[in-house]
A protein has these predicted regions:
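Canonical Radical SAM [4Fe-4S] cluster-binding loop centered on the CxxxCxxC motif
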Residues: 3-33
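Flexible loop/turn segments at secondary-structure boundaries
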Residues: 8, 59, 177-179
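Residue-level recognition of short, structured coil/turn motifs
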Residues: 13, 21, 72-73, 117, ...
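A short, flexible beta-alpha/helix-coil linker loop
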Residues: 22-26, 108-111, 176-179
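Short glycine-enriched, charge-decorated loop/helix-capping segments at active-site entrances
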Residues: 23-28, 114-120, 184-187
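Radical SAM/AdoMet-radical enzyme domain recognition
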Residues: 32-52, 60-173
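A C-terminal junction/extension of Radical SAM enzymes
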Residues: 174-221
Length: 221
């Protein structure tokens, strides 16, 4: 394998609708020693790309900064809600030099707040602007549903993200988890097909946008 994904923690400072990880509770953690052991052992056969999910990885930012500083021949990508990113955080990222980020967003304004909580969209925009101003590498993690799949692939949305410094989008389709999950938000076959063609259109050499889009499920081929 050339990439490894691990969860530093199951803890999160938000409680998003339909978040699969929420079903695991918020008390599970890997110690720094555990994470260091994982990376050390995986570097030996040549794995140098690590994705950190959760939970919210930035809840463990000090340990992750320490981990990245120790393993300078590897790269660490964090999936984050972006709400814990401030100038001090950006300064630390620049110090270690081998971290990048996928910031979660579901659309413009209320489209994000309805799932993640009031005010989260503005906090995400602030985090993006800080990261852009500090020259950091980041993209988005977008959960698309039957309600937002066209909005989060629209030209307006793409142009907005590009203006805030986003370099890539990683799309995941909605998966209903738990007793209270809304199955109506699942995409049907026609909507899935739309996403297949639209993502390829956005990243096309002709008529595309200067942003790289990946669809986790539909690009699995």
């Amino acid at each position: 394998p050339w990439i490894l994904l691990f969860d530093p923690t199951s803890a999160c400072n938000l409680h998003c609708k339909g978040r699969w990880a929420a079903e695991y509770g918020n008390s599970l953690n890997l110690s720094f020693e555990d994470m260091d052991c994982i990376v050390t052992e995986c570097e030996e056969p040549g794995i140098h790309w690590y994705m950190c999910t959760g939970g919210e990885p930035t809840c463990r930012k000090e340990d992750l900064f320490k981990l990245a500083a120790k393993h300078q021949n590897s790269v660490f990508h964090l999936f984050t809600n972006g709400t814990l990113i401030d100038q001090a955080f950006c300064d630390r990222v620049k110090e270690v030099g081998n971290m990048a980020f996928f910031i979660s967003i579901e659309g413009i304004g209320d489209a994000t707040d309805d799932r993640r909580g009031e005010g989260v969209y503005d906090r995400v925009m602030h985090a993006m602007d800080l990261m852009r101003e500090n020259g950091l590498l980041f993209g988005t993690s977008i959960c698309y549903t039957s309600a937002n799949y066209k909005a989060v692939t629209s030209d307006e949305f793409m142009d907005m993200l590009i203006s805030h410094g986003v370099r890539f989008n990683w799309y995941f389709h909605y998966m209903p988890i738990g007793d209270g999950a809304n199955v109506d938000l699942m995409l049907n076959a026609e909507q899935r097909e739309y996403m297949i063609h639209r993502v390829r259109e956005i990243r096309g050499f002709t008529g595309g946008k200067p942003i790289f889009c990946i669809d986790f499920q539909n690009d699995g081929e």
